[in-house]
UniProtKB/Swiss-Prot annotation:
GO terms for cellular component: cytoplasm. Monomer. CDD domains: Obg. Its main location: cytoplasm. InterPro entries: G_OBG, GTP-bd, GTP-bd_Obg/CgtA, GTP1-OBG_CS, GTP1_OBG_dom, GTP1_OBG_dom_sf, OBG_GTPase, P-loop_NTPase. The keyword Signal does not apply. Pfam families: GTP1_OBG, MMR_HSR1. An essential GTPase which binds GTP, GDP and possibly (p)ppGpp with moderate affinity, with high nucleotide exchange rates and a fairly low GTP hydrolysis rate. Plays a role in control of the cell cycle, stress response, ribosome biogenesis and in those bacteria that undergo differentiation, in morphogenesis control. The keyword GTP-binding applies. This is GTPase Obg. Its cofactor is Mg(2+). Mg(2+) binds at residues 173, 193.
């Protein structure tokens, strides 16, 4: 399935049905009074977050959503039928912005969460409402009220517990594939991952977490280089960042600082999230290189550095256990 994390769509709720002009027509009643019914309500436009979706690709092909008009009133004071609502299903984590792309209208960050974006128009009044002591046979009825319309932007920010970040070719896709059921494309060249990937890591029957792998970041990502500003949005909701660094590179400290700089430039709150630093591809390093690089990275970051080999899975069980503990603790804190 193709991945799409932004889409512009048009939505319009239904107009209200028209009220009608009608009079009683009964045997032996020559001058029946007014009995025109009201129009029915127009359909609403509702957005709902549902599980099982992780892309906005459907909105590339369907971009206009319109609810129906309410039914017109009828004689005998019959009200027109209300039109059915139009419910638009979107992935959990979808944000809805106004056409200016800045005004946030709704954040559907939980399964089942809904927002009524365009309310259907009210039905018009039938002539029964206009009867008075001086006007016993009113020939007036109201048209239904118009519905609401607008263009909106949808932006998907994936919901994951762990955000996997790093430069291109750091081994993120390999780690995701061995740690979860995800099967991302893997090759030994930069930018193998072209869009965010989600994987579920299940340690046992009761413990699991979701990890998001975003395409490798490059310098200037926070300003849009390589679409980095869009990709970074997918780790904003993560509780912990897993920063993967290619241990075979000569300038590992520089690479760590580059990613930290981009996180800070994009959003200081994102940079302030807890970070686990992992030196990957350690199977390609000698014991002396391992020790020296781990020490240099720990000194620069002021944090513990874990050693990992995605290829041989060295250090993987320890890393997954640490990630699960972080996720469990974060959920416990949120629950108060």
């Amino acid at each position: 399935m193709k991945f799409l994390d932004q889409a512009k769509i048009y939505v319009r709720s239904g107009d209200g049905g028209d009220g009608v002009i009608a009079f009683r027509r009964e045997k032996y009643i020559e001058f029946g009074g007014p009995d025109g019914g009201d129009g029915g309500r127009g359909g609403d436009i509702i957005f709902r977050a549902v599980p099982g979706l992780n892309t906005l690709i459907d909105f590339r092909y369907t971009q206009h959503f319109k609810a129906r008009k309410g039914g017109n009133g009828a004689g005998s004071n019959r009200t027109g039928a209300a039109a059915a609502n139009v419910t638009i299903n979107v992935p959990v984590g979808t944000q809805i912005f106004d056409e200016d792309r800045e005004t946030l209208l709704a954040d559907l960050d939980a399964e089942g969460k809904e927002v009524l974006l365009c309310r259907g128009g009210d039905g018009g009044l039938g002539n029964t409402h206009f009867k008075s002591s001086t006007n016993r046979a009113p020939r007036r009825a109201d048209k239904g009220w118009p519905g609401e319309e607008r263009w909106v932007w949808l932006r998907l920010k994936l919901i994951a517990d762990i955000g996997l970040v790093g430069l291109p070719n750091a081994g993120k896709s390999t780690l995701l594939s061995v740690a979860s059921r995800a099967r991302p494309k893997i090759a030994d060249y930069p930018f193998t991952t072209l869009h965010p990937q989600l994987g579920v890591v299940r340690l046992n029957n009761t413990e699991e977490f979701v990890i998001a792998d975003i395409p490798g970041l490059i310098e200037g990502a926070s300003e849009g280089a390589g679409l980095g500003d869009r990709f970074l949005g997918h780790v904003e909701r993560c509780a912990t960042l897993l920063h993967l660094i290619d241990g075979t590179e000569s300038q590992i400290v520089k690479h760590w600082r580059l990613i930290r700089k981009e996180l800070e430039a994009y959003d200081p709150e994102l940079a302030a999230k807890p970070e686990i630093i992992v030196l990957n591809k350690c199977d390609s390093l000698t014991p002396t290189q391992r020790s020296a690089k781990k020490r240099a990275l720990a000194k620069a970051s002021g944090a513990e550095v874990m050693m990992l080999s995605g290829a041989t899975q060295e250090g993987l069980p320890e890393l997954l256990r640490l990630l699960q503990d972080r996720v469990t603790a974060a959920k416990r804190d949120r629950q108060g």
